[in-house]
């Protein structure tokens, strides 16, 4: 497996204890003799630890426990207890239940990214590098930036690029959060930000707009009406977990396939970057 570059967004939260990692450590011990399962657990650990330490996580592939993984577990048990099928069957009963728990943890790893780090879009060094190269230093406005992970990565890759990073934190429904922005984020709504910086940039970025609001559709209408020359890039799941139905119904989309190829789908969310008109 080729090692990815390291890319930092800052000091990270440096949490001393993470429930998710504690659970994975137990599973890693249980399945240490099953390489395919062990690799997935180790990669999940690596991803969470990286974000906690202030680094963008590695590329993930499909994380669910597959039928091949199940066969590998059964083969390992058979090799361990070739002459004791009764004992082997009991071990399999225990490990089958553990596998279901592993599968749940791995397929819901994005929930961990969100709960402990407020990282919604899955941003890897490869993805950010490809996007940075595509932007090619053009002045860019990020709206609804959340904690600023996207722009922080772009800034780290190209420090001279002019980036306006904005969010009014309407998305933050919990009353208290210990997660702080990883880059300076100006408190502006999406529409306010476009009106303020629309004449100073060439690109507008929007990532993981909520599916409970039509602010994304309002943004698209504003860009079409007043700033038609701006390039509008959107990260999200078409007709899925992000953005409003109205937005997807009205947006003219171009899949940026070269950038998307750097980040395969790893969970139930088919997250992509699109150029939108």
Task: List PLM regions with ranges.
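Conserved SAM-binding motif I beta-strand of class I
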Residues: 162-167
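Conserved SAM/SAH-binding beta-strand->alpha-helix loop
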Residues: 169-171
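Short loop/helix-cap segments at secondary-structure boundaries that form the rim of catalytic
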Residues: 173-179
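N-terminal accessory regions of S-adenosyl-L-methionine
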Residues: 1-121
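Conserved class I S-adenosyl-L-methionine
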Residues: 137-146
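Domain-level detector for long C-terminal conserved domains
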Residues: 179-277
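Conserved SAM-binding loop of SAM-dependent methyltransferases across substrates and taxa
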Residues: 147-159
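Conserved alpha-helix/loop element of class I SAM-dependent methyltransferases that forms part
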Residues: 114-137
């Amino acid at each position: 497996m080729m090692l990815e570059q390291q890319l930092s967004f800052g000091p990270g939260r440096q949490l001393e204890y993470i429930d998710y990692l504690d659970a994975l450590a137990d599973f890693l011990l249980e399945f240490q003799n099953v390489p395919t399962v062990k690799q997935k657990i180790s990669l999940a650990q690596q991803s969470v630890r990286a974000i906690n330490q202030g680094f963008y996580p590695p590329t993930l592939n499909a994380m669910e426990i597959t039928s091949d993984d199940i066969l590998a577990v059964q083969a390992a048990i058979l090799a361990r207890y070739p002459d004791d099928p009764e004992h082997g069957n009991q071990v399999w009963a225990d490990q089958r239940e553990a596998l279901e728990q592993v599968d749940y943890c791995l397929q819901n790893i994005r929930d961990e990214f969100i709960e402990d780090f407020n990282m919604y879009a899955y941003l890897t060094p490869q993805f950010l590098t490809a996007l940075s190269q595509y932007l090619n230093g053009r002045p860019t406005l990020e709206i609804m930036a959340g904690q600023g992970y996207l722009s922080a990565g772009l800034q780290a890759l190209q420090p001279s690029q002019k980036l306006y990073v904005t969010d009014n934190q309407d998305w933050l429904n919990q009353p208290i959060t210990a997660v702080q922005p990883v880059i300076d984020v100006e408190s502006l709504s999406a529409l306010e930000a476009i009106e303020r910086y629309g004449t100073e940039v060439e690109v507008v970025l929007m990532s993981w707009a909520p599916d409970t609001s039509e602010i994304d559709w309002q943004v698209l209408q504003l860009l079409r009406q007043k700033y038609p020359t701006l390039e509008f890039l959107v990260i999200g799941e078409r007709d899925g977990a992000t953005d409003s139905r109205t937005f997807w119904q009205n947006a003219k989309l171009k899949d940026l396939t070269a950038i998307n190829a750097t980040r395969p789908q790893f969970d139930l969310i088919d997250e992509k970057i699109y150029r939108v008109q």
